Curated annotation (Swiss-Prot):
PANTHER family: UDP-N-ACETYLMURAMOYLALANINE--D-GLUTAMATE LIGASE (PTHR43692:SF1)
Molecular functions (GO terms): ATP binding; UDP-N-acetylmuramoylalanine-D-glutamate ligase activity
Function: Cell wall formation. Catalyzes the addition of glutamate to the nucleotide precursor UDP-N-acetylmuramoyl-L-alanine (UMA).
Pathway: Cell wall biogenesis; peptidoglycan biosynthesis
Protein name: UDP-N-acetylmuramoylalanine--D-glutamate ligase
Gene for this chain: murD
GO CC annotations, alphabetized: cytoplasm
Record's keyword annotation contains Transmembrane helix: no
Length: 449
């Protein structure tokens, strides 16, 4: 870790404790800053707050007093806290510096960074790159929005390692010098407008990922959205990925992934399903190769990586039937992607919390659905949907019962897909719990060895 001197003796206000705030506060203290931690919640029993107080840090919970700004501190803000919060908006009015802890990760580490942002696909791309580094026996450390605090991981990184960091638009708003060696924008669609205000502001936040790049750096973008990249002042080398066009970068031709004219692998030999995941794969392969990963390691990942848990996750086969866990599909858009990912007949397990919405937008994606098994509060709605499209529909009490009922109707080469299109809270505490039960139920039907 670099002994960064730029914060020594400076007043720093960490707003929002949580995991990233806790790690940022400890790091700032280590760097010699005068640290105050503030959180709107009750911290009287919070173990992290107590730990920071033992270190001599000032911790204030329960409210955000504006008097905390009187010392003109640098603010390190939890990315989830909106700029509309009075303390933050007042800090903006006063012209105070407002950072997120991901900026700290850059300031303290010499390790090059592969940074991934986008509306969809961030976690999958980040995880794919990490797996490719692992299989190449190079050190690639996952961090950021994927669940590992960037500033904590950066402290462990050696100069020869890579930091592979997933970044949200919230995190990117709070950077100043942050400069990834390789930046990826998977795609940009309308999202988080309650936070950013307008689509253009959201896009501008995403574009910050490449603003500090130099001629020695690389930017990887979706060719279909190349018009969203502002080229004025852009210094980095731009490469594209495309599933339909030959581009300067990586693309698909005659079913094969092509990199600089080199044929890597046929898409049918890739384990991770779905056309949307093919775009994620292209971006990850290009970034990994630019980072020094061998082609052999890339191929090893593509022929083994089955996805992020609960996100169109391949969980195994029973005879000729493959099972996929897409429990994280808590809305119809996610289920559209899932249903569109297979050419084989599908036994579709669906249902969950009723939020009052309909499901007609799924109809164009149901052509390969052979059987529907419905459960949860939306069971009646989804049953009617299936029957209206001439599908064979079975009612189940829950996910376990649905998997049990699969065994009565399954035929050779059917794909069994849990993609609920609904939140889990009517029957399960989390989508993870729902997905885990699906996996357990599948395993219970495997032949005994």
């Amino acid at each position: 870790m670099l002994k960064y001197k730029g914060l020594e003796g400076k007043n720093v206000l960490v707003v929002g404790l949580a995991k990233s705030g806790y790690e940022a506060a400890k790091l700032l203290h280590h760097l010699g800053a005068n640290v105050t931690v503030n959180d709107g919640g009750d911290l009287s029993k919070d173990p992290h707050a107590k730990d920071l107080e033992k270190m001599g840090l000032k911790v204030i919970g329960g409210h955000h007093p504006l008097s905390l700004l009187d010392s003109n501190p640098i603010i390190v803000k939890n990315p989830g806290i909106p700029y509309s919060v009075p303390l933050i908006s007042e800090a903006e009015k006063r012209g105070l510096r407002i950072l997120t802890e991901v900026e700290l990760s850059y300031l303290i580490s010499e390790a090059p960074i592969i940074a991934v942002t986008g509306t969809n696909g961030k976690t999958t791309v980040t995880s794919l790159i990490g797996d490719m580094f692992d299989k190449s026996r190079q050190t690639g450390l996952l961090s950021g929005n994927i669940g590992y605090v960037a500033s904590k991981v950066a402290q462990e990184a050696k100069p020869e390692d890579y930091l592979i960091t997933e970044l949200s638009s919230f995190q990117l708003l709070g950077i100043e010098q942050y400069r990834p060696h390789i930046a990826i924008i998977t795609n940009i669609y309308s999202a988080h407008l309650d936070y950013h205000g307008t689509l253009e502001e959201y896009r501008n936040a995403k574009r910050r990922i490449y603003k500090n790049q130099t001629e020695d750096d690389f930017l990887i973008c979706n060719y279909n959205q190349r018009h969203l990249i502002e080229t004025d002042g852009l210094k980095s080398k731009v490469y594209y990925f495309s599933t339909s066009q030959e581009v300067d970068g990586i693309y698909v031709k005659d079913g094969y992934i092509m990199l600089n004219g080199l044929r890597l692998i046929h898409k049918d030999d890739i384990v991770l399903p779905g056309e949307h995941n093919l775009e994620n794969i292209l971006a990850a392969v290009l970034a990994a190769v630019l980072g020094g990963v061998s082609i052999d390691a890339v191929i090893a990942t593509l022929t083994s990586f089955s996805g992020i848990k609960h996100r169109l996750q391949y969980i195994g086969s029973n005879k000729t039937n493959k099972y996929y866990n897409d429990s994280k599909a808590t809305n119809t858009l996610a289920t559209q992607f899932a249903l569109n990912s297979f050419n084989q007949p599908i036994i579709w397990l669906c249902g969950g919390l009723d939020r009052g919405n309909g499901f007609d937008e799924l109809i164009p994606y149901m052509k390969n659905v052979r059987v529907m098994i419905t459960f949860g509060e939306t069971q009646d709605k989804l049953t009617k949907l299936g029957e209206s499209q001439g599908k064979y529909v079975i009612r189940a009490t829950d996910v376990k019962d649905a998997v049990d009922k699969v065994q009565n109707v399954i035929e050779p080469n059917d794909v069994v897909l849990l993609s609920p299109a609904c939140a889990s809270w009517d029957q399960y505490n989390t989508f993870e719990e729902r997905g885990d039960i699906f996996i357990e139920s599948f395993r219970a039907h495997l032949p005994s060895k």
